[in-house]
């Protein structure tokens, strides 16, 4: 099974990611996104970051996850090569927000991303991704395989 495929969309770029589990499709979506930024084959495991994300919806978790990784690239130049998920929890209960609103079911993802700082002298620059979007976003299980389609603003 392939991990991801790039989608050519007028004015934007997207990808489809595949996995045998929700965790795996999230990892493959992130690796696909990184491949849009640079050639990930030449990256080294020199540094690591730990990312923890919570959301009330699975699709929101995916968008938040990818946007957090984009933030680490924009702010610190960090780009990942390998990802290890340490926690993926579905349907836990979040406490209500201030004012009593919110709470209810949620999803949590915690992962360590291994990679290095992007160096334009050593790494090929491809696309500058601004954000993962909800446009045409879907995440579903088809024939025992999890699949997501996500569009990025560039």
PLM regions with names:
Residues 98-102:
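Glycine-biased, low-complexity coil/linker segments
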Residues 2-90, 106-154:
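N-terminal intrinsically disordered, cationic/polar leader segments
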């Amino acid at each position: 099974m392939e991990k991801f495929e790039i989608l050519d969309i007028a004015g934007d770029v997207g990808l489809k990611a595949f996995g045998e589990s929700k965790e795996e499709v999230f990892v493959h979506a992130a690796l696909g996104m990184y491949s849009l930024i640079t050639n990930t084959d030449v990256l080294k495991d020199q540094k690591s970051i730990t990312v923890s994300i919570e959301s009330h919806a699975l699709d929101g978790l995916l968008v938040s996850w990818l946007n957090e990784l984009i933030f680490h690239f924009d702010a610190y130049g960090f780009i990942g090569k390998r990802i290890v998920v340490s926690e993926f929890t579905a349907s836990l209960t979040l406490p209500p927000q201030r004012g009593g609103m919110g709470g209810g079911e949620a999803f949590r993802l915690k992962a360590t991303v291994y990679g290095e700082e992007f160096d334009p002298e050593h790494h090929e620059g491809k696309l500058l991704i601004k954000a993962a979007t909800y446009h045409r976003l879907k995440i579903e299980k088809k024939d025992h395989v999890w699949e997501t389609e996500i569009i990025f603003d560039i």
